[in-house]
Amino acid sequence: MGLILRWKEKKQLSSKQNAQKSRKPANTSFRQQRLKAWQPILSPQSVLPLLILMACVFAPIGIGLVVSTISVQRLVVNYTECDALAPAKHFETIPSEYVDYHFSKKVAVQPQWMVLTDPELGNQTCRIQFEVPNHIKKSTYVYYRLTNFNQNYREYVQSLDLDQLKGKALIGNDLDPNCDPLRTVENKTIFPCGLIANSMFNDTFGTTLTGVNDTADYLLTTKGIAWDTDSHRYGKTEYNASDIVPPPNWAKLFPNGYTDDNIPDLQNWEQFKIWMRTAALPNFYKLAMKNETNGLGKGIYIADIELNYPVRSFYGTKSFVLTTNSIIGAGNEALGIVYLIVAGIATLFAILFLIKVIFKPRPMHDHSYLNFENSDTPFDESSVVSIPLREIL
C-alpha cells in the first residue's frame, strides 16, 4: 500500500513539474491573438472621400508655402573662388554661375567683386558690391552657406565635452575621450576640445554693409543669433590661461595662445553656439548676422569678407547669403512643391476612382452582397469554383 501511495505522489509531482515547464502561452485574448481588430475593406467609394480630403488639405498648404517663398528676397554669392578669380585693383562682374538673386524689382547693376590683400599680414578680403533695387521693409539676415561638409558623422557629432563647455576646468583623462585626438597638447588642455570646435567657420563678415554714393550704411549685429535653448549648455570657464591652449585651427585667431584677457567666453559667444549645433545634411546654412529693427534701403552696398576658411580641402564651397525670411524661415521652394505634388497625386487618383465607379461599377463589391444569412438561394459550389481567382480578389 505504501508503495502505491509513493508512486502516486511521484506521478503528481512529475505532472506538476511538466506543467511548470510548459511553454504554452496563457489562455488570454492577447497571448492567443484573439483581440478584436478592425480590418477596413477599401473600395473606391470609401477611398474617394479620403483622397479628396487629402487634396483639399495639402493644396492650400502647398500654395501658401510657394507664395511665401516667392516673397523672400535674397542674394547668394558663392565666393569660394574670389581669391583666384577676382581682380585686385578694381571691381569686376561676378560670373553668373557664382551668383543667384531674387528681388521684387529688376537689378540694374550685376554683383561685382574684388580681392584685397594686407601687405603686412597677408590676409585676403573678398569685397562684394551689389545692388538692392527696392526697399526691403522686412528684417534682413546674413547667413553663410557651406556645401559638402558632413557634420553628421557620429565621430564628429560626439567630439566635445559638455561639462567643459559649461565651464568646468577638466584636465587630461577627466575630459570626454570622444574629444580625441584633440584633448591635450604638450600636457596642456585644449579649450574647447574636440573636432567640432576645431573646425569652426572662421571667415569674418563685416558687420556693416557700406553704402555707395548716397546710400546710407546698413548695420548688422551678431547679438541674438543663437537659439535661446542653447544658453544652458555654455558657461564661463574656470580655466587659468596657463593651463589651456586653443584648438590647432584657431591659431590665426589666437596667434600667441590664450591670456587672461582673451580666453573666449563661450556663454556669450553666439557664433560659436551656432557652429556647435551640427547640421543634419552636408549642405547647410548658418546664421551669421541680422537686423530686425530697420529695413534695408534701396541702393548699392559693399560687403567685406575676410578669407580664412579652407573649403577646397574637402571639395566644398562657401557662400554669402543676404535674405529676408518667410513664415517658415528662409526660402524653401522644395517643401511647397512637395505638398503640391501630394495634392496633385491625390486629385488624380480621386478622378480615376470616380470615373471607375461611374462608368464601370462592380456591384458585387457592394457590402450588402456579403450578407448571406437571409439568402433563399441555394449555394452552388460549381459556380464558385468557376470564378477566376483574380475576380475573387
Curated annotation (Swiss-Prot):
It is found in: Golgi apparatus, trans-Golgi network membrane. It is a multi-pass membrane protein. Glycans are attached at N78, N123, N187, N202, N213, N240, N291. Accessory component of a P4-ATPase flippase complex which catalyzes the hydrolysis of ATP coupled to the transport of phosphatidylcholine and small amounts of phosphatidylethanolamine from the lumen to the cytosolic leaflet of the trans-Golgi network and ensures the maintenance of asymmetric distribution of phospholipids. May be involved in transport from early endosomes to the trans-Golgi network (TGN). Residues 70-332 are annotated as: Confers specificity for binding DNF3. Residues 1-46, 356-393 are cytoplasmic. Present with 4510 molecules/cell in log phase SD medium. Disulfide bonds join C82-C126, C179-C193. One of its GO terms (biological process) is phospholipid translocation. The chain crosses the membrane at residues 47-67, 335-355. Keywords: Disulfide bond, Glycoprotein, Golgi apparatus, Membrane, Transmembrane, Transmembrane helix. It comes from Saccharomyces cerevisiae (strain ATCC 204508 / S288c) (Baker's yeast). Residues 68-334 are lumenal. This is Phospholipid-transporting ATPase accessory subunit CRF1. InterPro entries: CDC50/LEM3_fam. Belongs to the CDC50/LEM3 family. Changing C82A: Reduces interaction with DNF3. Component of a flippase complex consisting of DNF3 and YNR048W/CRF1. Interacts with DNF3; the interaction is direct and required for proper expression and endoplasmic reticulum (ER) export of either partner. GO terms for cellular component: endoplasmic reticulum; Golgi apparatus; phospholipid-translocating ATPase complex; plasma membrane; trans-Golgi network. Pfam families: CDC50 (PF03381).
